[in-house]
Amino acid sequence: VCKKTDQVEHMVDNFAYLINKLGFIPNGNRTYYLGRSQPPFFALMVNLLSEEKRVAILLKYKAALEKEYHFWMYGTEELNYRKPAIDRVVRLADNIVMNRYWDAKADPRPEAYAEDKHIAAASANAPEIVYRHIRAAAESGWDFSSRWFKDGKEMASIQTTDLIPVDLNCLLLY
């Protein structure tokens, strides 16, 4: 923690506050970010802090850790063969539940409205599908890597919510 344990703990306190208040850490501190989260690194931050502060710190953040996990797993109980995906959870054919990036909104991002409209106009998909894929990519922190593009080149081929990212699922298993 580089001798900055107090600073790290204050940052984790701020993230815990957001989780306890909203259920997740928003992509930013503006109301238009309330549809998407930050990637789930909170457990890793708490674990890093526990190297200095020991088990007591794990107990301090237990409720926030559980709440963030429940945010990412919301909808799991309602998944079935007719509805294999709800928000950030997807049930695969073998009944395993995995996670994906998602955004509750399906309209252009306020912070990049004109750009999103332009990308949607160039896409073969319906605009609301493109907007959700763009927003989900922003939630991932990989905005806008070619990993989300079907053709590997053009943002108009974005397909973020159709993919199950291994890194996201590893973070949630931590």
Go through each PLM region and give its residues.
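Acidic, mature catalytic/reactive cores of soluble proteins
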Residues: 1-174
